[in-house]
C-alpha cells in the first residue's frame, strides 16, 4: 500500500500534501484503521442512544466484587473508548475521578500501532484504560494478551465487550468463516456484548473506495455468502450459533447503524435483566429474525 514517490518514465514526485491526501483517504485504511475516525462518526451519536446508567443496571454488585471489566475491540485512536468510559461513569468533560479505575477498567485494542500510540498519549484516564496493539484474529497473541489482563483481576472473562463498527472489516478481510470465528471468540470472552454492525451498503462503499484508489480489492468481498441485512445476520450468528440472546436494541445512529446489546445465556440466572432494558428491548421487534 506504499505510495511511490517517483512515477515511471518521469521525474514527477508527489508533494507531501498529495501523499498525505492519499494516506488519509478512507479507502487506504482496509482494516478500518482511519486516522481521524471520530471526525466523521463522532462518539456523541452513540452516547445519546446509550443510558448512562447501563453498566450500573447490568452489574449492580460492582464494585464490591471488583471493577467492571470491559473489552473494546477496534478502538482506533481511543476517542470512543474514552467517551464511553466517561459516559458510563457520568464524568463531566475536563474532570477525572481518582476512584474511577476501581469501578470500571477497559482494555482497548486495535490492529494499528500508530493509532494505539496516539490513544495512549491522549488518554485522560491512564489508570483505567489500557491500550494495546492486537490483531484480534491472531489466536495465540489474543490469548496471551487478554489472559494477562484478566488474570490481574482473577477473572477468566470480561463483563462487557464493545464491538463498534468493526464487524465489516473482519468480514471483508477474513471472509464468512472469519466473521463467524470473530463473533464466537467475542461471545466466549464476554458476559455482555454491545455490537454496532455496519450495514451492507457500507461493504459496497468500502469496495468502491479501494477501486477508486487503484488498490487491490478485498480478498473475500465477492465470495461472501453472509450478506444483505447485516444487523439481522449478526443477530442470527450470535443467538443461534454462539449462545447469546439479544436483550436490547438502543436504536440507530444518524448514519443508520444499530446498537445491539447481547447477553451470554450462561450468565447466572439470578442476575436478572433490568426492567428498563426489557422495555427498551421491545424495539428489537423492528428487526426481522428470519434467515435470509
Curated annotation (Swiss-Prot):
O-methyltransferase that specifically monomethylates 5'-monophosphate of cytoplasmic histidyl tRNA (tRNA(His)), acting as a capping enzyme by protecting tRNA(His) from cleavage by DICER1. Also able, with less efficiently, to methylate the 5' monophosphate of a subset of pre-miRNAs, acting as a negative regulator of miRNA processing. The 5' monophosphate of pre-miRNAs is recognized by DICER1 and is required for pre-miRNAs processing: methylation at this position reduces the processing of pre-miRNAs by DICER1. One of its GO terms (biological process) is tRNA methylation. Keywords: Cytoplasm, Methyltransferase, S-adenosyl-L-methionine, Transferase. It catalyses: a 5'-end 5'-phospho-ribonucleoside-RNA + S-adenosyl-L-methionine = a 5'-end (5'-methylphospho)-ribonucleoside-RNA + S-adenosyl-L-homocysteine; a 5'-end 5'-phospho-ribonucleoside-RNA + 2 S-adenosyl-L-methionine = a 5'-end (5'-bismethylphospho)-ribonucleoside-RNA + 2 S-adenosyl-L-homocysteine. The gene is BCDIN3D. It comes from Pongo abelii. This is RNA 5'-monophosphate methyltransferase. It comes from the Eukaryota. Its EC number is 2.1.1.-. GO terms for cellular component: cytoplasm. Gene3D superfamilies: Vaccinia Virus protein VP39. Its main location: cytoplasm. It is found in: Cytoplasm. Residues 53-274 form the Bin3-type SAM domain. S-adenosyl-L-methionine binds at residues 46, 76, 110, 135-136, 164. Interacts with DICER1; the interaction may be mediated by RNA.
Amino acid at each position: 500500500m506504499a505510495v511511490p514517490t517517483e512515477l515511471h518514465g518521469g521525474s514527477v514526485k508527489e508533494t507531501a500534501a498529495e501523499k498525505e491526501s492519499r494516506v488519509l483517504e478512507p479507502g487506504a485504511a482496509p482494516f478500518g484503521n482511519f486516522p481521524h475516525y471520530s471526525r466523521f462518526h463522532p462518539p456523541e451519536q452513540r452516547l445519546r442512544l446509550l443510558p448512562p446508567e447501563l453498566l450500573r443496571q447490568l452489574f449492580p454488585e460492582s464494585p464490591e466484587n471488583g471493577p467492571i471489566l470491559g473489552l473494546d475491540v477496534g478502538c482506533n485512536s481511543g476517542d470512543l473508548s474514552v467517551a464511553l468510559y466517561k459516559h458510563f461513569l457520568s464524568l463531566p468533560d475536563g474532570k477525572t475521578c481518582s476512584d474511577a479505575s476501581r469501578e470500571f477498567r477497559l482494555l482497548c485494542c486495535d490492529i494499528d500501532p500508530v493509532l494505539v500510540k496516539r490513544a495512549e498519549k491522549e488518554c485522560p484516564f491512564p489508570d483505567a484504560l489500557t491500550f494495546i496493539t492486537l490483531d484480534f484474529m491472531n489466536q495465540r497473541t489474543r490469548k496471551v494478551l487478554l489472559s494477562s489482563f484478566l488474570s490481574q483481576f482473577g477473572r477468566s472473562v470480561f463483563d462487557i465487550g464493545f464491538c463498534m463498527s468493526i464487524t465489516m472489516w473482519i468480514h471483508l478481510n477474513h471472509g464468512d468463516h472469519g466473521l463467524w470465528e470473530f463473533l464466537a471468540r467475542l461471545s466466549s470472552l464476554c458476559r455482555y456484548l454491545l455490537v454496532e454492525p455496519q450495514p451492507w451498503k457500507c461493504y459496497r462503499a468500502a469496495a468502491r473506495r479501494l477501486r477508486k484508489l487503484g488498490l487491490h480489492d478485498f480478498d473475500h468481498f465477492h465470495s461472501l455468502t453472509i450478506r444483505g441485512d447485516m444487523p439481522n445476520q449478526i443477530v442470527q450468528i450470535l443467538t443461534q450459533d454462539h449462545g447469546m440472546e439479544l436483550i436490547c436494541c438502543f436504536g440507530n445512529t444518524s448514519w443508520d447503524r444499530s446498537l445491539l446489546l447481547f447477553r451470554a445465556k450462561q450468565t447466572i440466572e439470578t442476575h436478572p435483566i433490568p426492567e428498563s432494558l426489557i422495555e427498551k428491548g421491545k424495539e428489537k421487534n423492528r428487526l426481522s429474525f428470519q434467515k435470509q
